[in-house]
């Protein structure tokens, strides 16, 4: 064959291959199973495969765990007990308003242990918009496609004289009614783990595409054939059909926290679409949301990790509002039990998500956060407090008053379509009050903090240093928010002063944050390796850096940049030793730090996640670049063990998303993002204002983690931060990456990011 003929043949083959090659879209890179290989003693995410819409009210998940078990799906499990509508934000908070369904064949079985079927991941498809599993014991294929408040299920049965569909409304008080003339099952569940009013119910409705050949209800485990109503502790229903092999049953399901009638209204989200149309709709929605960040890379594994993290970043906070028959936005209040107008969101802990999840929304999805801010206005009106951990109402979890950060950063980022004055009232109120039944809401110890400048170690308020540090940052947030609102200097002065209260728990002898007694002395004995006690799920090596708004002030306390950098280095150099005596056992966060071989750096928990970026304040940004790449490549992947600790409702995922883009919000509310180094060759951020941010990294091989040079908008750029204004105007970044650090770049005083102590009063 001549060279010309050979070349023509190669081109023809390439053309054929190109014609048949699959075109990948963002959602195709997502694995919803990332983080699901978790257990109580060791978290690799503590996630479940949420089949859902972005910020949807209802999620669906296959269920491997027992009813009420926070570990609802674990990758290592062999059997599925059902398919659950869930509202669970984490296994530690657990679920509410949940119920399950399960197809089966043969004699009807309700007990979840007995009805469970073997399944295999080889016959499982798990995407954000579609889930499929093969129930081997029944020869049944079950598929799910969701909308925000509804879902459609398609069940492919074998030939069976009695093919059944189980509806399990769970225990703690439930109700089910079969409506044969309408091919429907309706009911409600009251199951929850706290944070709900007494009248809480999740009403559900299931509409089948054919008449029932068999009906029964379940009363506390007893199947009552032919009966139509069950109201008891643990209610359920089983409806049956005669099926041919390959026959498909379609079930349309919706729910409401308002009423059964509203659940029927929510069923209209499905319209007249069949299963495949709903599935296609969901796929488009996910591609629209994920496609706001466009990534080009030769590394499929990194693309899978990135988009799997972005998927987790847009699940929570959960929508908790509905549209009534008039098309009005309404919600059942998880705070006072009334049905009221307006938005409501839930299932997020601000202790986690103030750090970078909400800042990500403010960059990429600000219109969603405007709705969330309106929801916070309603939460305050209905309960007298802003939530700190909501699921669905106030929950007693974590510390701090970080709703102030959520509110301030949104407003300072230009979000305005809500009642900001009411939120000002709310954040100020939270500085001088504690919720009467949920002490983690408001400020526990505010009397001491406002008088002494810290929460003392010896007044029976635990995690006191953590509280002091977070209250100080929150006061800074309130100060900035108030300035933007035009509040008087007199009104703002207490917050300005208290923003420096972090100084009051800094021990110059150890250069670490340390518990302080009411009389002013520091606690004795003191171990920087002791977890808990004065800190929250961390130790002094972790919390010393929780001065988000004033790293320069912390540098000054330590005696300068050299000591500051040595202390930062020490976090990685100190062996992963620990003192767990406060807990009396090794909690999973400790174990996750211990096994990662990064010294005392604990990326699996939130308090220290910003720490790597602090080298940019102290003139050694190349260390940020090195440790960012180490953390991204070692602590994250797209497998079931893909996280190095709890994913925490988008926070740990949003860290990866920001870091991959090459910048991170160390101090939400400052209007600045600290630079690291991008992970991908090219990224384009499609902003809601119509502008685009372009990020290009030349010579971006795996070993080239250091920034040799950076150009911003065509000009050399040495600063270690970028402003929000730069981003919103459509910034263009061009990096030249290298395998050796450039120790001349980013070292000038003017290159350092924002610090409060550098601002003139």
In which residue ranges do the predicted regions lie?
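Accessory carbohydrate-recognition regions in carbohydrate-active enzymes
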Residues: 22-358, 362-405, 411-469, 477, ...
């Amino acid at each position: 064959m001549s060279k010309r003929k050979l070349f023509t043949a190669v081109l023809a083959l390439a053309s054929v291959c190109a014609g048949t090659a699959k075109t990948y879209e963002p959602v195709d890179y997502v694995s919803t199973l990332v983080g699901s290989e978790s257990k109580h003693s060791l978290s690799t995410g503590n996630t479940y495969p949420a089949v859902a819409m972005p910020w949807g009210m209802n999620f669906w998940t296959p269920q491997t765990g027992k009813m009420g078990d926070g570990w609802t799906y674990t990758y290592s499990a062999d059997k599925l007990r059902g398919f659950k509508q869930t509202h669970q934000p984490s296994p530690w908070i657990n679920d509410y308003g949940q119920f399950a369904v399960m197809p089966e064949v043969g004699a009807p079985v309700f007990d979840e242990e007995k009805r469970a079927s073997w399944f295999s991941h080889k016959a499982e498809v798990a995407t954000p918009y579609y889930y499929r599993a093969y129930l081997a014991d029944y020869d049944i294929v079950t598929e799910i496609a969701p909308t925000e408040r509804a879902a459609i299920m398609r069940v492919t049965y074998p030939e069976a004289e009695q093919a059944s569909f189980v509806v399990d409304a769970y225990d703690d008080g439930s109700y089910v009614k079969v409506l044969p003339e309408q091919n429907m099952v309706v009911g409600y569940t009251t199951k929850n783990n706290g944070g709900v009013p007494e009248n809480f119910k999740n009403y559900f409705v299931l509409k089948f595409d054919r008449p029932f050949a068999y009906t029964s209800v379940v009363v506390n485990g007893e199947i009552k054939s032919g009966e139509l109503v069950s109201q008891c502790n643990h209610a359920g229903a089983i409806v049956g059909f005669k099926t041919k092999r390959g026959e498909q049953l379609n079930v349309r399901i919706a729910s409401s926290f308002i009423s059964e009638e509203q659940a029927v209204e929510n069923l209209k989200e499905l319209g007249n679409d069949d299963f495949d149309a709903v599935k296609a709709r969901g796929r488009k929605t996910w591609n629209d949301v994920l496609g706001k960040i466009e990534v080009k890379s030769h590394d499929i594994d990194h693309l899978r990790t990135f988009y799997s993290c972005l998927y987790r970043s847009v699940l929570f906070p959960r929508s908790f509002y509905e549209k009534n028959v008039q098309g009005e936005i309404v919600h059942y209040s998880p705070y006072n039990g009334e049905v009221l107008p307006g938005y409501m969101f839930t299932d997020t802990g601000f202790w986690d998500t103030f750090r970078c999840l909400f800042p990500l929304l403010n960059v990429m999805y600000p219109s969603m956060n405007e709705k969330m801010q309106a929801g916070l206005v309603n939460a305050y009106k209905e309960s007298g407090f802003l939530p700190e951990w909501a699921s669905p109402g106030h929950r007693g979890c974590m510390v701090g008053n970080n709703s102030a950060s959520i509110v301030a950063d949104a407003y300072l980022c230009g979000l305005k379509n809500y009642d900001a004055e009411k939120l000002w009232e709310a954040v100020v109120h939270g500085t001088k009050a504690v919720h009467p039944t949920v002490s983690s809401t408001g400020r526990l110890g505010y009397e001491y903090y406002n008088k002494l400048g810290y929460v003392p170690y010896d007044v029976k308020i635990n995690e006191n240093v953590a509280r002091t540090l977070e209250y100080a940052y929150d006061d800074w947030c309130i100060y900035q928010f108030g300035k933007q609102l035009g509040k008087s200097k007199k009104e703002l002065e207490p917050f300005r002063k208290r923003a420096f209260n972090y100084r009051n728990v800094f021990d110059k002898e150890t250069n670490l944050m340390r518990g302080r007694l009411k009389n002013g002395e520091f606690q004795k004995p003191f171990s920087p390796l002791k977890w808990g006690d004065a800190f929250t799920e961390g130790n002094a090596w972790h919390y010393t850096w929780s001065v988000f708004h004033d790293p320069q002030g912390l540098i000054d306390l330590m005696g300068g940049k050299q000591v500051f950098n040595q202390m930062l280095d020490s976090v990685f150099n100190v062996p992963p030793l620990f003192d767990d005596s406060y807990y009396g056992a090794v909690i999973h966060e400790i174990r996750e730090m211990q096994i990662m071989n990064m010294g005392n750096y604990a990326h699996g928990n939130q308090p220290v996640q910003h720490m790597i970026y602090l080298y940019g304040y102290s003139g050694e940004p190349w260390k940020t670049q090195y440790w960012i790449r180490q953390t991204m490549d070692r602590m994250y992947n797209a497998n079931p063990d893909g996280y190095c600790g709890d994913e925490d409702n988008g926070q740990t995922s949003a860290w990866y998303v920001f870091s991959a883009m090459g910048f991170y919000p160390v101090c939400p509310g400052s209007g600045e993002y600290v630079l690291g180094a991008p992970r991908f060759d090219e990224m384009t951020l499609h902003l809601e204002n119509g502008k685009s941010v372009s990020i290009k990294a030349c010579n971006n091989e795996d070993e080239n983690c250091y920034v040799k040079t950076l150009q911003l908008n065509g000009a050399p750029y040495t600063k270690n931060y970028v402003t929000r204004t730069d981003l919103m105007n459509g910034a263009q970044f061009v990096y030249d990456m290298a395998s050796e650090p450039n120790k001349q770049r980013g070292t000038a005083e003017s290159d350092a990011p924002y610090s409060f102590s550098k601002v003139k009063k």
